[in-house]
UniProtKB/Swiss-Prot annotation:
PROSITE patterns, alphabetized: NI_HGENASE_L_1, NI_HGENASE_L_2
Biological source species: Methanocaldococcus jannaschii (strain ATCC 43067 / DSM 2661 / JAL-1 / JCM 10045 / NBRC 100440) (Methanococcus jannaschii)
Binding site for Ni(2+): C68, C71, C391, C394
Keyword Flavoprotein among UniProt keywords: yes
The protein, known as: Coenzyme F420 hydrogenase subunit alpha
EC number: 1.12.98.1
Subunit structure: Heterocomplex of the form (alpha(1)beta(1)gamma(1))(8).
Keyword rRNA-binding: no
Broad enzyme group: oxidoreductase
Organism phylogeny: Archaea, Methanobacteriati, Methanobacteriota, Methanomada group, Methanococci
Cofactor requirements of the protein: Ni(2+); iron-sulfur cluster; FAD
Keywords from the named record: FAD, Flavoprotein, Metal-binding, Nickel, Oxidoreductase
InterPro entries, A to Z: Coenz_F420_hydrogenase_asu, Ni-dep_hyd_lsu, Ni-dep_hyd_lsu_Ni_BS, NiFe-Hase_large
Family: Belongs to the [NiFe]/[NiFeSe] hydrogenase large subunit family.
Amino acid sequence: MEVNFVTNRIEIAPTTRHEGHAKLILEVDEEGIVNKAYYLNTTPVRGFETMLKGKPAEFAPIAVMRICGICQTTHGIASCEAIENAIDCEVPDDGLLLRELVGIGNRLHSHPLHHLLTIDDFLKPDETDLKIELIKLIQRMRKVGQLVVDIVGGEGIHPPNIVIGGMRTNITERAKSRLYYALRQYEKDAYELYEKYTELIERYLEEIGIPDLGAHEYPYIATHTTYGDRYAINWDDVTEIPAQRYYDDEEAKQTTTIQIPLYAGVPAEGGPRARMVKFGNFREGGSAMDINIARAQENLGAVYRALEILDELDLNGKTRAEVEYKDGFGIGVHEAPRATNTHMAEVGKDGKIKSYRIIAASTWNFPIVEKAIEGYPQQYAEVIMRAYDICASCATHVIVKDEETKEIIEVRKML
């Protein structure tokens, strides 16, 4: 941590226990309260949107799954959904069920990974036995999530069964039985983790004496509990602006590698709490630590839905539609573990990508993290940040410049 005592400016670089590379710049008053926060993505831009132009549409889901090794499944699903929407391709019911299931598997792995990265925020140094117990519990859960992706998706890291038109293949009766048994064990572990993890968070808030730590007044964005719904968002209200136009701080303008999505002109929180508020009875507007609790609750809802899918799935059902390309523009939405993940594709009748846009899940939460930190003591800034389970690799974005002036020029309306 670097402190400038003249300007009361604190830099935490890098921030830790999340995916990717980022840093926090905090402007604090004499009492250490954060007046202004900048949460800056320092992960290099890879340029996936530009890379896809002119490529065969089938390459898109394969490529975008390489954006991130944790969020690969959600990118593959959102990409396929966007292209299918562009060409009016209707995925068979069993293909959609399998696609939802593989996405849930990703969540069943990703959420516990976040719990693993955050337990040190709430455990005391002498609680070694409890820490070991929780780690073992979490690792069992992660293995089940990866098992679901491996069996349904065909591979645990970049699942090849997620294809345009649906899913490449169905699962067998033996695979179904194996998944059912594993998910039943996950259900027990998830409930145990929820109880113990929630107790730790509630104790932490009581001990620091800030029950509303990280609270903010910004809206939530979510489209579905376990899949995604492109019609749940008014796309006329979604804009994406360069960070250079969003920030008033020169270092922030020059450092961050994201663009800022806004909903109705303001930042919006996505992710577990947003989904639980929109589609459940979760409390609204509380501490950022509520996001950790909502994430633990989502483990339970996700595993229940996974078991339902196994009951609904026809193992002899068709899982993939015929694909015929035509000129079109489509939107694909999937509720990633961290927030709403959106891919937009313009496709030609030759089956090639004309243009491609991505608003990855964590992109929504970068500006929200800043708002959540402001007004609270600086020593809790990373704890608040970690509650959002940021994936910095996903949030990196293309930078659009004027070829002559080299100035950032683009403000993107989504439609």
